[in-house]
Amino acid sequence: MSAAGAIAAASVGRLRTGVRRPFSEYGRGLIIRCHSSGMTLDNINRAAVDRIIRVDHAGEYGANRIYAGQMAVLGRTSVGPVIQKMWDQEKNHLKKFNELMIAFRVRPTVLMPLWNVAGFALGAGTALLGKEGAMACTVAVEESIANHYNNQIRMLMEEDPEKYEELLQVIKQFRDEELEHHDTGLDHDAELAPAYALLKRIIQAGCSAAIYLSERF
């Protein structure tokens, strides 16, 4: 890893806060615990929770499509198992947000068909640049998602950390796993991708646009 990459990785690492918990602890009982601990459909900030669940569901769906595209190109190469492991975690993330969408009656973004195509195209397109291109995409996307999750964590902590305790735990857990994917990308030569810095900026600009649109539409 280059010196610049090491600094960036350290900076992202400082974003990690909270105590890690295994994903299995959340399970399907999350909804009951949310209600018993004070988070119900009646007493939450519905507008804020709607935005959080809708955009996070869209983001995890897009991440799944990115990894699907990468696996279509690199699935049979030596890096295939690495990508598959990250994809499996993203599948768990999407499953949880599917459950939250139903529990809190949140509609998905109308842009799902676009994220379906765009996510797969991004994953496959960067994978065609080789392992390094795919990992550069992973670094860019996962860093964007981790920062986005941190913004949500700060907002919920400021509003009512006890009321939103279970939702905060889910977001923190997923944030930490996204940062693990980010670090995996760096460990697998992301910075050796052609025009790495430019590619990363372009992908992260796209992520910012996707977040903005998915929160609102």
From Swiss-Prot:
Disruption phenotype: Mice lacking Coq7 start to die after E8. Heterozygous mutant reveal that the reduction of Coq7 levels in these animals profoundly alters their mitochondrial function despite the fact that ubiquinone production is unaffected. The mitochondria of young mutants heterozygous are dysfunctional, exhibiting reduced energy metabolism and a substantial increase in oxidative stress. It is found in: Mitochondrion inner membrane. Residues 48-217 are annotated as: 2 X approximate tandem repeats. Residues 1-23 form a transit peptide. GO terms for cellular component: extrinsic component of mitochondrial inner membrane; mitochondrial inner membrane; mitochondrion. GO terms for molecular function: 3-demethoxyubiquinol 3-hydroxylase activity; 3-demethoxyubiquinone 3-hydroxylase (NADH) activity; metal ion binding; oxidoreductase activity, acting on paired donors, with incorporation or reduction of molecular oxygen, NAD(P)H as one donor, and incorporation of one atom of oxygen. The keyword Iron applies. Binds 2 iron ions per subunit. NADH binds at R51, Y212, R216. Its cofactor is Fe cation. Keywords: Iron, Membrane, Metal-binding, Mitochondrion, Mitochondrion inner membrane, Monooxygenase, NAD, Oxidoreductase, Repeat, Transit peptide, Ubiquinone biosynthesis. Fe cation 2 binds at E90, E142, E178, H181. Fe cation 1 binds at E60, E90, H93, E178. Its EC number is 1.14.13.253. Pathway: Cofactor biosynthesis; ubiquinone biosynthesis. InterPro entries: Ferritin-like_SF, Ubq_synth_Coq7. GO terms for biological process: cellular response to oxidative stress; determination of adult lifespan; in utero embryonic development; mitochondrial ATP synthesis coupled electron transport; mitochondrion organization; neural tube formation; neurogenesis; respiratory electron transport chain. In life-span analysis, transgenic expression reverted the extended life span of clk-1 to the comparable level with wild-type control. Catalyzes the hydroxylation of the 5-methoxy-2-methyl-3-(all-trans-polyprenyl)benzoquinone at the C6 position and participates in the biosynthesis of ubiquinone. Catalyzes the reaction through a substrate-mediated reduction pathway, whereby NADH shuttles electrons to 5-methoxy-2-methyl-3-(all-trans-decaprenyl)benzoquinone, which then transfers the electrons to the two Fe(3+) centers. This is NADPH-dependent 3-demethoxyubiquinone 3-hydroxylase, mitochondrial. It comes from Mus musculus. The gene is Coq7.
